[in-house]
Amino acid sequence: MAATEPSGNPPAFERGGVLDMIERIGNKLPEPAILFAILAAIVVFFSAFGAWMGWQVQPVKLSYEMVPQVDASGQGVMGADGKALLVPKVGADGEKIRMLEPMGQPLKPRSLLTGEGIYWMFSSMLRNFTSMPALGLIFVAMLGIGLAEKFGFFGALMRALALATPKSILTPVIVLIGANSSVASDAGYIILPPLAAALYLAVGRHPIAGLAAAFAGVAGGFGGGFFPTGGDGVLAGFAQDAARVIDQTYSVGILHNLYFKAGSAIVVMLAGWLVTDWIVEPRLNRGKAAELAGVGGAGGASDEAAVIQSMALTAMEKKGLTYALATNVVVLGMFGLLILVPGAPLNGIGAPTLANGRVVAQQPVVISPGSAIATTPAEKILFKSEPVMNAAGEVTDPGLVVAMTGAKPTLLESPGDRWSHVIVPIIFLAFLVPGMAYGVVTGTLRSQKDFIEGLYHGIRSIVPVLAIAFFMAQFVNYFAYSGLDRMLAYAGGSLLVQADIPIPLLLVAFVFLVVLGDFAISGMLSKFGVLAPIFIPMFMMVGKSPELTTAAYRIGDSVVNIITPLNSYLLIILAVLQRYKKDAGLGSLISLMLPYSVVFFLIWTGFLLVWYYSGWPLGPDAPLHYGPKVG
C-alpha cells in the first residue's frame, strides 16, 4: 500500500482548541529561509545600534577554584618541585566550582552599517555560503544515501526486517527500525507506517497501534540510531562553528554523539514499546469494532493479507538485498583494514593537505602588520591584526596574530586520527556501493543514465536545505562579524555561572526550550542554526561541551516531531490513519501520538541525565565537559 496524499479534505482540528491555535500560529510564521533573512537583518540593526550606544562586554575565561590535593590520610600531596599539588574544588552537587577570570580588553560590537561593514556583507556573501562546514558534507553523503534509496535498497531492507519479525516482539522491532530509518531520508515515513499497520492487523492487533509505533520510531526517534547520517554532519558543522566563538581550536566530529545515539535508540525502542502496548493499544481496542467496521471486509484480514503479500520481497529483491549487504560488509571491512593495520593509509595521526601539498593549518598564523594571506591565486583576503596574548590577556609575542575581518577563520582541521578526516567518504561509499549492487541485481540500475539519476535523487532531497543554508550562512556570519556572538556568549555565560544553576536543571531547561521551538520552527537544521550560536558558547562557559549541548538538542528536536503541526509528513501518516478511521483528522493523529511525545520527553531526558552522571563520552573524542585542563 502506498501512502501518498489523503483522499478528500481531511477534517480539521476541533475549532478553538490548543492544537488549532498551534496550527494557526505555525502557519503564520515565515518559512525557514525567510526567517534567517529576517534574523540577519536584526543582527545588522543591533550591530549598528550597539556600536552607537557603546555596548561592551568583558571577555572572561573559565577556571576552577583550586584547593590542595590530599591523600587518604588527609596529608597534602607534594609535587616533584616540592610544591603542593592543587586540584579543583568540588561542590556538594559533585560539580567542580567554576570561576570566571577577566581576559583581555572589553569587546565592542562592530557595525555592519559602516562603509566597511556594507562592503563586507556584499563581498563575503558567496564565501559565507560556500565555507559552511556542513555544506560539502551533507552534499557528498546524500549522493550515496540518495542513490541507495532511489534503487530501493532501504525500502527492501526495512520490509525484510519488519516482515521477518516474530509477533511477540513486533512492537519493539518496528520502533527500533523507525529510530534507525533517519539514515534513509524519508523512506521511513513512506514505507514503515503503512507496513506496520498491515502487519498488526494481520496478526490480530489494532492496525492504528502499528501505525503509531512506526511513526513514533521514525519521527520521535529521529535523534537516535546506530549509524551516522548526513544530519549528524550538519549538527557537527554548526556546533564546531559555535564552539569556536569561545575556543578557536575546538573541533566537533561527525561521530560526536554516536554512543549516545546508539543508547538513545534502545531507550526509544523500550519507551515506544511501553506506550504502544500499555497505553495506546488498550485505548484503541476499546473502540476497535466500530473503527474497523467495513475495513477490508471480514474485519480487514483479507485486504491486509493482500497488502502484506504486495510488500513481501520477490526472489530478485531477496537476491539483491543479499548482494547489497555483502558488498556493504566488504566496503566496511576494507576501511577497517585501512584504519587498523599499522602503516595503512588511514592508520595513525595525520592532517588534511591541500592540492598543492600545503598542510591545512588550524592555529593562527603570526604575521607582520599589513600583510595579506593568499587563499587562491585570484583572491587575497586582508586581515586586521591584534597582539598575541596568553590566556590571562598578557602580550606574549611582539608579532601580530591574524584576526579575521570577516566572520570566521578559513583555517581548517587540526591533526588527529586519519580515519576521522574521512568519515564522509566512508558514509558515501558504504551506501553507494550496496545501493549500486542492489540496483544491478534487481534491474533498477541498468545504465549510466540510471546511475546519474540515482545521484540526482539524493541532491533533489537536499535542495530545500541548500536554500535555507544560504540565508542561514549570512545570519551566522553577520552575527560573528559584528562580534555580537562573542558578546552574547560571554554575557550569557557569565550570568549562568553567577546564577550557579545546577547543570541537570540547565540541560532539562534547554531540552524544553527546543521542544517549544519545534512548534515555531520546523526542521532540525533551522532550529539548530538559531540556537547553536547562542547556547553552545554559553554552555561552554559553564564547563559543558558542545557535544553535550547537541545531545540535549537531539532530544528536544525529536520528541515533538510526532505532534507538531509543522511536520510536513503528518499528512502522509494521516492518509494511512484514515484508512482505518474514516473520520480522523490531524487532531485525531496528534492526540494519538501525544502519549509518545510526553513519555519520550521524560524517559529520554532522564536517560541524558543518567549518561551525564555516569561520565561516559558521547562519541569518539566527544567529552561531556569543557574547561581548562587541570591535574
Model-derived features with residue positions:
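Hydrophobic transmembrane alpha-helices of multi-pass small-molecule transporters
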Residues: 1-143, 148-150, 257-471, 595-601, ...
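Extracellular/periplasmic helix-exit of transmembrane alpha-helices
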Residues: 228-235, 347-348, 470-489, 611-619
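Hydrophobic alpha-helical transmembrane segments of multi-pass integral membrane proteins
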Residues: 137-142, 166-197, 466-472, 498-537, ...
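Helix-loop-helix module between adjacent transmembrane segments
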Residues: 140-150, 168, 174-187, 217-225, ...
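Helix-loop-helix junctions that connect adjacent transmembrane helices in secondary transporters/permeases
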Residues: 480-505
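Membrane-core helix-loop-helix motifs of multi-pass transport proteins
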Residues: 23-27, 193-288, 314-322, 552-554, ...
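Short amphipathic alpha-helical coupling elements at transmembrane boundaries
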Residues: 20-27, 127, 156-163, 197-202, ...
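Loop-to-transmembrane-helix entry motif
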Residues: 25-33, 125-132, 161-168, 180-183, ...
